[in-house]
Amino acid sequence: MRRKLVIAVIMAVLGSAFSASVSNASQVEISATSVKPIELKQINSKLRIVSLANGAAEILNSLGLRNSIVGRDIASTTPELKAIPIVTSGHQVIAEKVISLKPSLVIIDASIGPKSAIDSIKKAKIKVASIPEAWNLQDIQKKVLAIGKLVNENSQARNLNGLMQKATIQSKSNLGWQPKVVFLYLRGPSSIYLIGGPGSGADSLVGALGGVDVGAKTLKTPFNTLTSEALIAANPDVFLVMSKGLQSVGGVSGFLKLPGVAQTNAGKTKRILSVDDSLLLSFGPRTPALLTKMSEALKAMK
């Protein structure tokens, strides 16, 4: 449900990546183009894979199986995957497109639908396999191993996990302070304003960097309706948002006009960390590099 909530809205607004920018020490943007995935050498495989599960295409690419991917979901936007056909409309699978590609394997997760499309693919005698979703740093390794098992590349999966684990450890450094962070999910035109709580995904990133996700400490569910009272009570030092979300409310100036924002420490100091929509909660081969960028940004905001 969480994945459907986030991705369904992201699909409508994903666009080209922005260059990384720092307007001043308090406002930092991390773009998709500024973060590189960890990749293994490309290998030959006879598999024909349609990757529909969130982040699966990116992991397959990093396992060295880019040439085996014959179809992908619209959320897989990294440059390496650009030439691969999209087989979804928004977040809805188009069964006819999938079947026409004659895949030997279709990878899905719990968020993929509609069920009728998946059933049609199965009726066409095509293997459909479901993998676990990743909502925190610990889930990444399980997801990579699950995909590695499906494609008979267990050794490659273990190697990739080892490289990512090493890079994740190296990404962490002393921030020099323990910032209180609030993650806001914003979609202005759709009037969607949510504050992240425990299990939003952002809490795992913030905690790994040595910060405190205030929403995760004080709220009960992954995503909660944003209120001025909740923001003022949380009183974060830094706001974490998605880049398109920030744009959707009119950029920094519009963001500061949202109820309660200007009354917080983060609002007063304009400490806003924005991250590309396809990157922030991707939890995959780009995550270690993302953590490095986030660490650098939070240090600069001290």
Language model regions located:
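Structured C-terminal subdomain patch of bacterial secreted/periplasmic proteins
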Residues: 30, 47, 139-152, 158, ...
